[in-house]
Amino acid sequence: MNSTLASITSALVLTFGMNVFAQDTKKPEATDKPKEPTAKTSPAKPKLTPEELEAKFKATLTKATLSGRWCSIKEGQLGLEKEDKYTIIGVNKVGGDVWMINARIQYGKKDITAPIPVQVKRAGDTPVIIVDDVGVPGSGTYSARVMIYNNTYAGTWTGGDHGGLMNGVITQQKE
């Protein structure tokens, strides 16, 4: 009985099974053409002008609070995350890519308000705040690169012999 069943199974596999493992290949037809975009395809968003990008940057950071976390980097290792908060009172363009950010900076037991001169460069439509060796009263000298995107921020910073990473969300103060 087992040999009969094995023979029938082998015959079925040989007869039908080979088609299971074969791949159907579609022969190219002369009528095959690239598909045209459908009406459902959304048109690309128009790019904002430099003036519109500056206005958006200013609106994002005026009367804004950046709340998030930072961690130190020591010997290539990330430290524990700690909370921080930056309150931006106002942002003004000085000229070219130089801006003045009036900020209240709170971290640890420190709470200071200071005008911070920064450069603002762009990665496409995304502003990147650049701070190079800027003295913060009562705190030291810092350098940083902070990207602003869709009401979030992320960046890296150094201060003397230490540095770290930072990230969080941006919220507008209600009037």
Sequence positions of predicted segments:
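Central antiparallel beta-sheet cores of small beta-barrel/beta-sandwich binding domains
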Residues: E51-E54, T60, A64-E175
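Residues at the start of alpha-helices and the adjacent loop-to-helix junctions
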Residues: N2-S3, L14, M147
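Amphipathic/hydrophobic helical signal segments and adjacent flexible N-terminal regions
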Residues: N2-A6, F21-L61, T65, R69-L78, ...
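Bacterial N-terminal signal peptides
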Residues: T9-N19
